[in-house]
């Protein structure tokens, strides 16, 4: 298969192919333009993969540009986080990082040009009055009483805005287009507003700041962007994008193309709702492993490869749809099944004593790090007479479908011996505290000599060598597929989205590195937490289970 045949195909790539074939463009230049007012989420990952992926595949360029036109909501913390996320996903921007604020001088000049052409005016209606005058989808707007000011008056008033002569909300610059337009975005949109706030890039140089719709198209043109890719909610804004560029003296006119945004089940991606989750402490922060943020997914144990594969699988269309969470989980499960080394950890431990094993002694059992990849090597795991097993792996009585340890019956310990449960010890409440067993000494990693069949296999950890670990069982943040549609999305937070257990792990995990994934055999995929784990306090996050338990629960 050729490189071209291996590329994904979608309507945007078809447009690019045609543009290159006809000579409309000789190269491809895209951009990823986030506003630095929050952390990136999985929806942004789709746009990152699209814009940077196209530039990569067509040997073009992709800019990282911060749409930093609202100093009140933006912070350098978000700038650094976004840069880190883009790089972590495996992409590199062309040249230096760009900022819309780099172009504030040019943007101001273009605003003055529109005023000189009679296409912009200073309006002194209040924000509420502007909304009232704008009309509705069913009713046209009406002209502002300030709409017909002279060019000279507008120039003077705009300079007064720039020099701080108006209070916030007392004046703005509006485009003069058509208050009766069927498209509300074209009803004399605001181009500049007043904000007395220090900007993280320009300091206090400006007290007027351009709006997104005015800034975005001009920034694209100044950077020589050939294909400006936006999500579908900006479809109507394309009319304003083109109007601005058509009415200023700028030689380049990029084209905007829209694609569907990513909607994902069992989460929300509204920045307002995500911020509410954080500020009201329903989650631990923007990087909480239950959040759909890239930093949250990374902390949970998702790999950049799995997120890129997910974005590739869902594709790029113009049709809005909601993607099943199982699709994202499947991508990380496949990745980690292929690449994660194996280890043993007991999440809900109960003591098991092998009475006929030499007491006080131990031996090393050799275990493969991956059952299908001998090149990943092996490790030695200590075994002794007292071990921990998972409480769910033992029953006093069970039917034939139960393939684990049952009183009076046998089971194999993973890569070790066959044992038989002989008796149990219980506390005053009737809870099993210890299981007493015997072992067949001639069954270390082999079948019994007499040919008897032992079907079940369970994992274990030597009690004398076990590492105490905190295990955080993360699950979907919401209990319904579309929490955003609920009257109160906070009311459908999944109460089981985080369950914390105290368990034991094999000693090799003392060397675990933050973020490195492991398959805890028979349990799921886990990684060492980057926030809470220390050398003396090991905390592991569940990335995803071995199988989709939500699908089974819904059947």
Swiss-Prot record:
Catalyzed reaction equations: tRNA(Gln) + L-glutamine + ATP = L-glutaminyl-tRNA(Gln) + AMP + diphosphate
Origin species: Klebsiella pneumoniae subsp. pneumoniae (strain ATCC 700721 / MGH 78578)
Annotated positions binding L-glutamine: 67, 212
Keywords assigned: Aminoacyl-tRNA synthetase, ATP-binding, Cytoplasm, Ligase, Nucleotide-binding, Protein biosynthesis
SUPFAM superfamilies: Nucleotidylyl transferase, Ribosomal protein L25-like
Biological process per Gene Ontology, one example term: glutamyl-tRNA aminoacylation
Protein name: Glutamine--tRNA ligase
Localization, UniProt: Cytoplasm
């Amino acid at each position: 298969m050729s490189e071209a045949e291996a590329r994904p195909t979608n309507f945007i790539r078809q447009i690019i192919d045609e543009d290159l074939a006809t000579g409309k463009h000789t190269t491809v230049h895209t951009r990823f333009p986030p506003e630095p007012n929050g952390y990136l989420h999985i929806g942004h990952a789709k746009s990152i993969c699209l814009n940077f992926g196209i530039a990569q595949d067509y040997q073009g360029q992709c800019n990282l540009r911060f749409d930093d036109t609202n100093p009140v909501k933006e912070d350098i913390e978000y700038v650094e986080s976004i840069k880190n996320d883009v790089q972590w996903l495996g992409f590199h921007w062309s040249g230096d990082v760009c900022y819309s604020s780099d172009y504030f001088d040019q943007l101001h000049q273009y605003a003055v040009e529109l005023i000189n052409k009679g296409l912009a005016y200073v309006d002194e209606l209040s924000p509420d009055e502007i909304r009232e005058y704008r009309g509705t989808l069913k009713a046209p707007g009406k002209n502002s009483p300030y709409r017909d000011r002279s060019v000279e008056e507008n120039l003077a008033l705009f300079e007064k805005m720039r020099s701080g002569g108006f209070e916030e909300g007392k004046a703005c610059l509006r485009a003069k287009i058509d208050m009766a337009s069927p498209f509300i975005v074209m009803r004399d949109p605001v181009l500049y507003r007043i904000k007395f706030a220090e900007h993280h890039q320009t300091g206090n140089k400006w007290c007027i700041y351009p709006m997104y719709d005015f800034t975005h198209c001009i920034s694209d043109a100044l950077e020589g962007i050939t294909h400006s890719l936006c999500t579908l909610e900006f479809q109507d804004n394309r009319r304003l994008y083109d109007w601005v560029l058509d009415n200023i003296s700028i030689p380049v006119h990029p084209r905007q193309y829209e694609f569907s945004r990513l909607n994902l089940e069992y989460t929300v991606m509204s920045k307002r709702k995500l911020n509410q989750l954080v500020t009201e402490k329903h989650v631990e922060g923007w990087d909480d492993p239950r959040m759909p943020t890239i930093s949250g997914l990374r902390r949970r144990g998702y790999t950049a490869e799995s997120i890129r594969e997910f974005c590739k699988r869902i594709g790029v269309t113009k049709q809005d749809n909601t993607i099943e969470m199982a699709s994202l989980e499947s991508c990380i499960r496949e990745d980690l099944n292929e690449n994660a080394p194996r280890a043993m950890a007991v999440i809900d431990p109960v003591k098991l004593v092998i009475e006929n094993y030499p007491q006080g002694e131990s031996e090393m059992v050799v275990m493969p790090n991956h059952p299908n990849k001998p090149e990943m090597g092996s490790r030695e795991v200590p075994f002794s007479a007292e071990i921990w097993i998972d409480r769910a792996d033992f029953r006093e009585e069970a039917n034939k479908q139960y393939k684990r340890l049952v009183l009076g019956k046998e089971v194999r310990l993973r890569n070790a011996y066959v044992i038989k449960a002989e008796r149990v010890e219980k506390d005053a409440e009737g809870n099993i505290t210890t299981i007493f067993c015997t072992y067949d000494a001639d069954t270390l990693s082999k079948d019994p000599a007499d040919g008897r069949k032992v079907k079940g296999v369970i994992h274990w950890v030597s009690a004398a060598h076990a590492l105490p670990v905190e295990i955080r069982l993360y699950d979907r943040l919401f209990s319904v597929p579309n929490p955003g549609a609920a009257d109160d999305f906070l009311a459908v937070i999944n109460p089981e989205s985080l369950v914390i257990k105290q368990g034991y792990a094999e000693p090799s995990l003392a060397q675990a590195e933050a973020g490195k994934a492991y398959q805890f055999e028979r349990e799921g995929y886990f990684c060492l937490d980057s926030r809470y784990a220390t050398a003396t306090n090991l905390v592991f996050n569940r990335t995803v289970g071995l199988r989709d338990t939500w699908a089974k629960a819904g059947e």
